[in-house]
Amino acid sequence: MRRLHIILGIIALLIAVQAIGGMLLGLLIYQATPNSVLTRQTFIGRIPGMLTSVRVIDRSMNILYRGQKPPEQLMHYDLAIDEKDLKAIEESLPTELPSPWYGNLFLTDDAKQWANATFTAGGETYKVKVRVRGDIFNHWAYRKKSWRVKFPKEKLFNGIREMNLIIPEDRLWFVEFLNVYRMRKFNLLHPPMELVTVSMNGSKPLLYTQIEHWTKEMLEKQGRTGDVNVYQTGGGNSYFQQWNPVFEEVGYWDKYFSKPTGDTYEEIDLLLKLSEEGAHKDPSYMRKLTTIIDTDRLVSWYVVSVLAGSRHVTDFNIRLFFDPSRGKFEPLPWDISIYVPRTLLFLPGNKFLNEAFRVPAIKLAAHRALWEYVQNDEQIADDYAERDRLYALIERSAYRDRLKLQSNRQVKQELEKLLWKTESNIEFIKDELKISEVLTTERIPSLADQQRGIIRTLDFTARGVAFAAFSEISIPQQYVELVEQGVIQLWRDDGNGSWGTEDMRISLAPLGEPNKDNLVVIETQDEALTLLWSEDPVLDANGSVKTAPHTQHRFFLISDGEPVDPDAFKSKIKVRNAVTGKKAQIIGDVVVDERTFERLDEAYMNREEFLKRYPFFRAEGEDGVALRGVHVINETVIVPSTVRLIIKPGVTLRFAKDASLLSYAPVTMIGYKEMPIRMRAVKENEPWGVFAVLNVTEPSAIQWAEFSGGGEAYINGTFFSGMVAFHNSPVTIVDTIVRDAHGDDGMNLKYVYVDINRVRFERNSADGLDIDMALSGVVENSLFLENGNDGMDISWSPIVIRNIESANNGDKCLSVGERSTPLIYDTILRGCPIGLAVKDDSHAKLERVRFETNGTAVSAYIKKPFFGEPSVSIIESTFKGNREKTLALSGAVITIDSAQ
C-alpha cells in the first residue's frame, strides 16, 4: 500500500509540474502576443466568453509590471463631479452613429453637455465647468474619459482659462511631448502641455495629458497677441460625412476665437484659392503664398511632422493662427502623433499642404532642414535623451492607472513600439534623403537646330526623393575661352521644349585645369535654375505610392556666334543631390543623335510637297515623279512612299560629297545600251553616299545603269553599307555596272528575292556584292573583278549562283556564311587568295566550277563559335594552278567527286 501511495504521489507531482509548465508557457505566449492577434487569428476569439476571460487574465497580470522610478513627481489634481451630473453626462453621450455615412460614434455639439465640478490642485480649490471632449468615442465611451475644464475668468488656474485632460494613449503616451519638445527648437507656437495625474471623485490617480486649450490667455502668455483669428477644422456638421471637407467650402471652417474687428473669413477664402489643384503653377503663386503665410514656420512644421512620420494632418486636424498685425497665417502643430516610416514621396496630407509643397523651393528648404536635423548627432542624442526621460516619467503612472482601457502588457508593448518608431523614422529619413535618382539624355541636335546655334540639348528626368541639381558640365579645353567670352551659353527651357529668348540663361564659370581627358569643368552658378525637382508620384486608388515620379527638365547649350562642331564637342555632366550635396544616382545616361530621324517625315510627304521641295523632278501619271536630263545633287534627296520614282534613259546624276538618293517608293530605272543611266560623284576624290530603296513592297527594276564613286550612308535610322542598296525591297537588276564604291559594298541586298543578271562589279574598295537574308533567287551571268575584299559575300541566303566569273579580288572570290545554302554551278573562281570560303553552318553544293590560280581553292571553317560545322559538296569541277586545293578546319567537311 505504501508503495502505491509513493507511485501515485510521483504521478501527481509530474502532473502538477507539467500543469505549471504549461501555464508558464501559455503566459509567456500570451505576454508576447498582441490582443488583436489573439482575437482575430487564434481560436480564442471564436470561443464564446473566452475573449472576456482572456482580458480578465490579461489584466490580472498588471501586478507584474512596476515601471521605472520617475525622474520627477507629476502634478496631481482632484476633480469632483456630482454623481447626478456625471450620470447626466453619461446619458447624453452618443450610443449610435449620427448617420450611416459616419464611421465612428461621434460627439456632436448637442452631446457636449457642461456640468459643475470642483477642481483642486496644490491646496487650492476652483469651481469649474467640465464636459467630455474629443470627437471620437475612444475619449468618452469607456470609464476613463477625456475632459475639458473651464476655469472662471476671475480665478484662473496658473493663468489657464481652459484646459484639456486627454487620455494619454490618444496622444501616444510620451510621443506628443517629444513632438512639442522638437517644436520648441523651431520656435513653433503650440499649446502648453504637461503630464499629470487626476483623482476623479476620489479615485486612485489616473494618468492624463494636460493641454491648455486655445484661448487668448494662452496666446498672450506665449508672447503673441490674443486679438487674432485661430481657426480649427473638424466634423460632425453634416449628415453625409464624418469629417468636413474643409477645402471645398469656407463654411466648413470654424474659429476658437476671433479678432475684435470682425468675425469674417476672407483669409480662409484666399487660403482655399491657394489650395486649388494646380494653383502652384501660377507664376505668382510663391509671392502670394509668402504674403499670406509664414513659410519658414510652415517648413519647420513639416520637419517636426516628418520626424514623426506623421500622416495625421488631413482636413480634420488643422489649426491655423492668423495674425492681423502681420497679415499672415502661422501653422499650429496639433496632434502630430507618430507612425511607422513611409517614403517622403507621399504628399503632406491635405490640399493646402500638398499644393504648397509642390513649390520646389519650399520642398527643397524642408528637405534640407530635415537633413540638417538628422545629420546632427548632438540634436538626435538630445531627442533620444528627452524621449527616454519622458518614458521614465510616464511608465510607472501608466501601469498604476486602474481605469485605463489597456492592460499593462499592452501598454508596455505600445511604449516599446513607440521607442522603435522614434529611432526608425530618423534612420529612414537619413536613407530617404540620399535617394536622388536622375536619368540623363544628351541630344546631338538636328542640322536645323545646329543652324540655330544649339550644340547640345540636355534632358534630365528626376525621380528621386531628394531633388537633384545640374551642377557641372565638363567640355574640351578649346571651348573654354568661348564660355568665358559668353559665346557658349547654357539656358533652361521654359517648358515649351524648344530654345528661344523666353528661356532662362544660366551663368557659367570655368574651374581649374584640364583633366586627363582634356576636359575642363564648367560650374553652373544659379541653383534655382539648375534645380531638378520631382513632382507628384503616381498614386493608386487608395492614395498609396504606385510609381516614383518622372519629372522632366530640359537645358540648351548654345553658341551665340562661332559655330561649334557637335561631333567634336565631347562633354561630361555632373549632377548632385541638392539636399545632401553628394553625387546624385545617375540610373540612366544615354546619347540621342537627333540627326538620325530628322528627315523621317519626308518618307511619307505627298507628291505636291515633294515636287515643291525638289522642282527638278516632274510629275508623271497619277502618282509618279520623273527625272530627266543631267542634275547635280548637292544634298540627300528622300523620295516618299506616296509616289513612284521613274528615272528616264540617259539621266546623269552627279552627287556632291555624302549626298544620297533614298527612295521609299518603287523605282523604275530603265536605260538603253546607247543611253545608260549614270550616278557618279561630282568630284572623283569626294565620294557621294548611296542610291537606296527601303521597305517597298512593289518591285523595282534597274537596267542599263552605271553606279560609281559612292560609299555608305546612315539615313533615317538605317545604315546602308552598299553604294547601291535594296533593303526589304524586291528588285530586278540587269545589264548594270557597279564600280569604284568607297564603302563596305558596291551593292547590298537585304531581305529580298535576288534577281541579278549580267551585272559587272569591279574595283569596289571592299565587297562587290553583299547579299544578306535573301528569301531565294539567282545571281547569274555576272562578273566580279578586282574588288578590294570579296567578289561576292552571302549570308543567311538560299540562292542559286550560276555562270559567274569572280577574279582577282583582294580576299575571297566567293564567300558563303551564316547558314547559307547556295547552289553554285558553271562558275569560274580565279586569282583570289581564297577561291571559295564556306563558314558557320553553311552548306554549299557546287557543280562544274573551275578553281584557277587561287591561294586556297576551297576553305571551310567556323568563324563564329556559336555556329555549327559547314560543309562543301563539289562535283564535276576542276582545280588548276591553286597553291592549296582544300582547307577544312573546325570539323568542316569538304567532299569532291568527279573532279579533274
Residue ranges and their predicted role:
Residues R2-G123, A381, A392-I587, E594, ...:
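Regulatory N- and C-terminal appendages and interdomain linkers associated
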